[in-house]
Swiss-Prot record:
One of its GO terms (molecular function) is hydroxyapatite binding. It comes from Dromaius novaehollandiae (Emu). Ca(2+) 1 binds at E16. Keywords: Biomineralization, Calcium, Disulfide bond, Gamma-carboxyglutamic acid, Hormone, Metal-binding, Secreted. This is Osteocalcin. Ca(2+) 3 binds at E23, D29. Disulfide bonds join C22-C28.
């Protein structure tokens, strides 16, 4: 059987969409370099 999120194949990163949004915002991207993506995203867009 196949389980979603199993070790077979590359499981999609649930935060990938938010990471892309932050990377497209120069201010969020810069802040992420200093405090990490999740915290930078939270400051700009609210809870991840």
């Amino acid at each position: 059987s196949f389980a979603v999120g199993s070790s077979y194949g590359a499981a999609p990163d649930p935060l990938e969409a938010q990471r892309e949004v932050c990377e497209l915002n120069p201010d969020c991207d810069e802040l992420a370099d200093h405090i990490g993506f999740q915290e930078a995203y939270r400051r700009f867009y609210g809870p991840v």
